[in-house]
Amino acid sequence: PATGQDLVLRVNTGSQMHLPDQIAYEFAALTDLLPTGRTPRPLFYDDSRAILPYGALVMTWLPGRHLRYEEDMGAAAEILADIHALPVPENTRLLRPDRPAGSIYQECLDMAGRYLAWEGADKTACRLLEALIQEVGRLPLGDPSPAPPAIVSTQLNSGNFLINPGERSYLVDWEKPLVSEPAQDLGHFLAPTTTFWKTDVILSPANIGDFLRRYATAVGGRFDLRSLAERLPLYFTVTCLRGVSWCAMAAVEYAQPGRVLTNADTQVKLGQYLSEDFLEHILETYVRRDFLRGVAL
């Protein structure tokens, strides 16, 4: 622009939430989140599709590098605490699932189902996906939560954090925000299917316990954390299923001719996540046993 200000133009080619006005939804989310000081400022959006065949959003550019799990967990805890402490605006248009964990599980069934019905699916991957679906389906996915509502990102891989050591850090890529409970974000952030996506890191129980203590300190009593110990293991486990189910769906999409967007690194990760070794590891380590047992705030 004439001002010389660095801006970001986001062009949306589809909606993972199946919304007819995806770019307007993202604009609304960023508007709600503005008081946190942790997200881009939305400037305007155009969903007319008069010039481009897609919706477009302009927002401020923010500095920072991607999160490093080995050294940036304190910064991540502070970012998430500030976002989760934001009172949900009464007039928010963000979706609010009645039973968020159950909604995630249903999404997993839909995504994995596409792979299970695909003629190119690997038989071993299908067997293990079906086992994961069956085991996770036994969890109390429909239980109501006593946790206070919060705006959650639902997309907390390391590449969506902008870290500035010693200065303010940020969270970007607000494509799929919801009104839910903080445990949903924390379960997603800490799950191996998230940390391993852009890095080779899988967090230990000690790593997770240290992060949760930092998060509680950063929250500083701004909202009630008493239900977190009960709700976090549920979201942690269902997120593991969601991670591999998403990869299964993406493998089908990447195999389609004429796909608009592709990424070589993503294709490599899809193969890793759908391998027998990785799926077995998720099933035995994170689903068939309580990986977070003994981890406390």
Q: Predicted segment positions?
A:
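Short, flexible, mixed-charge acidic loops at enzyme active sites
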Residues: 49-58, 184-186, 251-254
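ATP/Mg2+ or Mg2+-diphosphate-binding catalytic cores
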Residues: 127, 243-297
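Conserved protein kinase catalytic core
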Residues: 16, 50, 66, 161, ...
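Active-site acidic catalytic loop and adjacent metal/ATP-binding pocket
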Residues: 1-4, 8-9, 42, 136-184
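Acidic, serine/threonine- and proline-rich low-complexity regulatory regions
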Residues: 222-234
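An alpha-helical support segment within catalytic cores of ATP-dependent transferases
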Residues: 88-154, 164-166, 223-224, 285-294
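Active-site activation/catalytic loop segments of kinase-like enzymes and analogous catalytic loops
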Residues: 186-223, 237-257
